[in-house]
Amino acid sequence: LVRHFVQQGFQTVGMKPVAAGAEMMNGRLLNSDVAALIKAGNVDADLALINPYVFAPAIAPHIASEQAGVKVSLDNIQQAFDGLQSQAEMVMVEGAGGFRAPINRQETMADLAVKLNLPIIMVVGVRLGCINHALMTAGSIRAAGLTLAGWVANRIDPDMLAIEENIATLKAMIKAPCIADVAWGEEPQFIDL
């Protein structure tokens, strides 16, 4: 999505507020998703704004933060987001772990999305069980008072049976447009933005 908006001529930056699973690069922890967001964007923003919380172990972010003795704060994330908004026309925020994944012992990615008042683009890993999971997540997004702006069909299981039928069911039942259908191992081609 970041690359798409850059190609459309927007000053665009990606943000991953909380990331777990990082390696030392030039004396700082860097998560591979964050590196990809930086590469895709066209705004030279401070890494501390793009990724305010980063932890080395590839485990649930709230557990990684506890092990590091760090409390993830929605207010700090809001300040970083506001800083990015002052530098870019588009700030694309990537979650971690799913819509209801905890970021600390009291708050989840859903709370973060509500605080930042973000429209949501849901990524559906197309595999057995994805219909139920996607419909529950879409319902959870709406119950939080947020807009489900669209969804992406990410074909993560190249051997899935009845894949086209599953995607057709998702398109019929999710009350938002499918903005991309990503084949196994390919880059997304956006359908409807």
Residue ranges and their predicted role:
Residues 2-71, 75, 80-83:
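N-terminal phosphate/diphosphate-binding loop that engages ATP/GTP or pyrophosphate donors
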Residues 3-8, 38, 165-172, 185-188:
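Short, basic phosphate-binding NTP loop
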Residues 19-22, 127, 156, 186:
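Short, glycine/serine-rich, charged loops/turns that create anion-binding
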Residues 25-26, 61-65, 102-104, 133, ...:
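Short, well-ordered secondary-structure micro-motifs
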Residues 50-53, 95, 181-184:
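Conserved beta-strand termini and adjacent loop/short-helix elements that scaffold enzyme active sites
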Residues 59, 172-190:
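Beta-strand-loop-alpha "switch" segments that mediate conformational coupling across diverse proteins
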Residues 74, 78, 188-193:
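Short, amphipathic alpha-helical "lid/cap" segments that border enzyme active or binding sites
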Residues 76, 83, 90, 95-175, ...:
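Conserved catalytic-core segment of NTP-binding enzymes
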